[in-house]
């Protein structure tokens, strides 16, 4: 059964060079920051776009300020479930019932668990959380 919660996703840009991600990971470890999600993509202008969901928002904000990352923040929905056939479809049906548009969705399955990060208009977050959690 899916469990959904609201999370803050931070987005920032780094240079796209060998070792930059490792350096960031080492700094995060030194600051004792745990990430629930990390996504990185190269851009055409020798930069990379990073998106992450930290376990503790305030701690990451302090880190980002000291590291001069200048992140933007957005509220996303993090859905986690044990793999049961049809959970993905049920979540999408819930989104459709509310006539909410998904701006982006990312998914990963590991060790019989599946997780999704759903980005949608902020006005839909609370109703989607309620509907996803009540549908189970």
Where are these regions (language model features)?
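A conserved regulatory-domain signal marking ACT and ACT-like small-molecule sensing domains
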Residues: 1-136
């Amino acid at each position: 059964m899916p469990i959904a919660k609201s999370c803050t996703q931070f987005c920032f840009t780094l240079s796209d060079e060998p070792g930059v991600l490792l350096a960031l990971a080492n700094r995060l470890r030194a600051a004792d920051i745990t990430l629930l999600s990390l996504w990185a993509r190269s851009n055409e202008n020798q930069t990379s776009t990073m998106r992450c969901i930290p376990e503790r928002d305030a701690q990451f904000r302090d880190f980002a300020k000291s590291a001069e990352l200048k992140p933007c923040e957005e509220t996303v929905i993090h859905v986690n479930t044990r793999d049961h056939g049809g959970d993905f479809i049920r979540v999408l049906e819930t989104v459709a019932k509310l006539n909410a548009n998904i701006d982006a969705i990312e998914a990963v399955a590991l060790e019989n668990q599946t997780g999704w990060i759903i980005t949608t208009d902020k006005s839909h977050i609370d109703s989607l959380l309620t509907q996803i959690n009540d549908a189970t």
